[in-house]
Amino acid sequence: MNKLKFLIILFITFLFNLKYINSLKQCKISVLLSGDWSDMGYNYQMNNARIKAESALNLEMSLCYKNLEVSIDLAKQAIEDSIKKGANFIVISSSVHTSIGYEYARLHRDKDIYWLIRGRGRPVPDDLPKVAVINFNTHLLHYTLGLVSGYLTTSGTVGFISPGPQILALANSNSFYLGALASRKNVTFLNAYTGSWYNPEVAYKASQMLISNGADFIGMSQDDMSVQKALMDSGKMALGITGFSNRLIWGSDIALSYITDWSDVFIKYAGHILNDTWPEYTDYYTTLAEGGSLLFDTFSYRVPSEVQKLVSLEIEKLKNSSYQPFRCNPMYSQINLNFDSNGCANDMEFKNTKLLLKGTDISKTINLGLYTIPIEFVDYSNSMKLGLTIVSGFCILFCIISMVLVIMFRHAKIIKSASPIFCLLILFGCIIIFSGCIIFSLSPTDGICGARVWLLSIGYTIFLGSLLVKNWRIWLLFDNPKLKKRSITNWKLYPFVAGILAADVLILALWQGLGDIRSESRIGIDSLTKYQYANVCSSNDQGSVALYILLVFHGIKLLAACFISFKIKAVDIEEFNESKPIASSIYIITFCLFIVIPLMVSPQSVASQVITIVVCAIVTTLISISLLFGSKFYMMATQGLALNQTFATNTKSSSFSLSLEKQKSKSNGLEFEDSDESEEKLPQIKNYSNSEIPNLQHNHSRLAHFSSDSCTSAEQDSKLDLENQNDENEIENNQNNQNNIVEDCQKVEKLEKDENLEKDENLEKDENLEKDNENQSIIQKKRLSKNFNQSEIDPDDV
């Protein structure tokens, strides 16, 4: 029986506790912030209060929405999302969203949802019993900091930055001015607007404007410290006006900070919800009194002790809510405010005024209005432009000096072999390239966008085109297996250079005409802010296609240069062989392309792209001309000019062809065809006395001088000596390796004695050699060998 009674009592107790637990309300906080909770200011303090309340009351969770000032729609979405997630205590922390808070409070008035809304008064009509209004008395805080500014200013000018009358009335601006006026009677006050609670860039720039006008202390109604950062960046002391203890971050640079602690407010009203004791139609007024959510931090040691004492005395007075020097001042009659019986401006008129006080006889106020950041043009840095211009100018000077040297020493053997006129064309093309680099470093305009591509492209075309054509001639002369007489003058080569240049100009014209090449201003590129812009070159899709074709065209020229470099690598006369410089130049250009192309594709700033292109153009061009001409000038300096000397070779890597014709009526010796300085021709051989053509044992051909010594068939070796009878004739005997020219030649038929020959000698005849019985000159084909004597070529112009 006793057990039954005990169980009944236990069951009743359980039901009672269960009913009590169910009767307890839950509280889920949702805070709407105008800015970011990491601003170390007002939004940070609000979010910090949410966290403290959640911890103090053991709440399961709470919500926070940030950066809602950007859009009213975002604030509405945040409220709807909060209600959807079960929040029943919604805090509207910014006066920007006051009306939205009242709107949704009315929309959900029948629901068990409570509201804490920052505003300047209760809603009209006041039909929202579950709404508590925070009256944030910032005026006394700004008055105090204005007092500090008036004491500390050295310029006599202070300023204030606020969102503006369309967002926030000018009560804070007037309060700050009255505080500064209380400590300095002749103070000058500057006022400016940003149009927003949170716009760091505009606030910073507006502060710089006030500083440039003499302000050394600036108050503000902003959610971050951008204004004070501008002061500190200029070497001045700042004020802590965000509700956070800013000295914890910036130390002694902060003269004084006010602090807001909203945790007591959050805990108080959340407790009312949990205990079901919500006070209807209430207002919360912030004060400097104990528990009033407002207090001042400690002074910086840089603030004089006398100033600290004076300000501290004023703070003690302000703890009495009846002491309101920021509102009770006869100067408000300047802006037609009404006064109460205590001599203070009407509270609502004071809080809502959009007019700035006019100052006194010795103190003036200047309203600079809404500040907007001017759109700033950002050009390439002067150091970049100056550096690229100087380097390019030095390279142009190097090319000009090289051109002068080529002209002065055009008769030197090493310069003749390189064709002076084409050397000048190559250097001229390089000058155009370096000029294009200078243009490339300038700020883009419609003209510059086209000119820089034209100059670089035409410069490379003249440079590579001249190099290709002049070495193509070397290849043709040395690669002559049929021993044809070839006369390739400069005038025959000019059309090829002109043709390559014409193709380049045609592609460029298509690019210019179809591509809509222009300079346009863009914002938001690279590291630019939304208030900065830069000029960039642009084109349409057709222009891009034409540009790709142009790149392919230049790529083909590089491949052609590779091919010709390979074909002339066997030329054994050093003065003619430019295979190594050409190959090295191509390697360098290709290497730079492997650097440039990935960099151009990868994200990088426009300035970085310009630097990459220009530096690669300068490096490749400068190294190329250094390889081509540096070695020539060095040989001239170390080995002499070698004027009117012959070219010589004693290697076996090249073969030369010689056309021999019998001339019966002329004297013995070697005769060359007449030619101008730019013409290359093969020599012609006249009558030979007491000579025979030797047996070609090594399957090589060469150009040699025939002597009058007899040769026997037993020796099978002859010494050949060709005597030059015409010093004015100009030739270029250039041929490539020909191993198969004389493989079937074992013996050469004996030459019929000329009337001037003194004796005949018989040579062994090869069974496989055709006889020439018509007393004609026999074509001699010989290749140089290490075992043969040295050959000589007359060095006129090649």
From Swiss-Prot:
One of its GO terms (biological process) is sorocarp development. Residues 752-798 are annotated as: Disordered. One of its GO terms (cellular component) is plasma membrane. Residues 410-419, 469-494, 567-580, 631-798 are cytoplasmic. PROSITE patterns: G_PROTEIN_RECEP_F3_4. The gene is grlA. It comes from the Eukaryota. PANTHER family: METABOTROPIC GLUTAMATE RECEPTOR-LIKE PROTEIN A-RELATED, METABOTROPIC GLUTAMATE RECEPTOR-LIKE PROTEIN C-RELATED-RELATED. Residues 714-771 form a coiled coil. Glycans are attached at N186, N275, N320. Residues 1-23 form the signal peptide. Keywords: Coiled coil, Cytoplasm, G-protein coupled receptor, Glycoprotein, Membrane, Receptor, Signal, Transducer, Transmembrane, Transmembrane helix. Residues 752-774 have a biased composition (Basic and acidic residues). It is found in: Membrane; Cytoplasm, Cell cortex; Cytoplasm, Perinuclear region. It is a multi-pass membrane protein. Disruption phenotype: Cells have tip formation delayed by 3 to 4 hours and complete development with normally shaped fruiting bodies only after 26-27 hour. Cells are able to form normally shaped mature fruiting bodies, however with a lower number of produced spores. May play an important role in the terminal differentiation. Residues 24-388, 441-447, 516-545, 602-609 are extracellular. GO terms for molecular function: G protein-coupled receptor activity. In the N-terminal section; belongs to the BMP lipoprotein family. In the C-terminal section; belongs to the G-protein coupled receptor 3 family. GABA-B receptor subfamily. The chain crosses the membrane at residues 389-409, 420-440, 448-468, 495-515, 546-566, 581-601, 610-630. This is Metabotropic glutamate receptor-like protein A.
